[in-house]
Amino acid sequence: MKYRSRTEIVSEILEVAKGDGVSKTRIMYGAYLSFSQLKEYLSLLLHNGMLSYNKTDKRYRITQKGHEFLRAHQSIEGMLQDKN
């Protein structure tokens, strides 16, 4: 597996968290993270307001700020695509 940048990992986590919300396990498997990596990134995304956590159903959801990050990341990735 190739090296992934921090922004690529964040983008993958946010993609997994779209919709009705997801558990820690779903994020971990969906973004191919170890548990220690998962804890680090969840903390980062919660602190920066890109994910929210619902204590009642124990689910993580992408926020508006998270959606904005995804759109920006996808736009940048599109600009960097090889046009061949």
Question: Which ranges hold each PLM region?
Answer:
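Basic, amphipathic "hinge/linker" alpha-helix immediately C-terminal to the N-terminal HTH DNA-binding motif
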Residues: 58-73
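Short helix-to-turn junction characteristic of helix-turn-helix DNA-binding domains
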Residues: 13-17
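A short, conserved structural fragment
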Residues: 46-55
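Short alpha-helical segments that sit at the start of domains
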Residues: 1-11
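Short amphipathic alpha-helical interaction segments
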Residues: 32-47
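Amphipathic alpha-helical dimerization/coiled-coil segments
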Residues: 75-84
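Short acidic, hydrophobic short linear motifs in intrinsically disordered regions
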Residues: 21-30
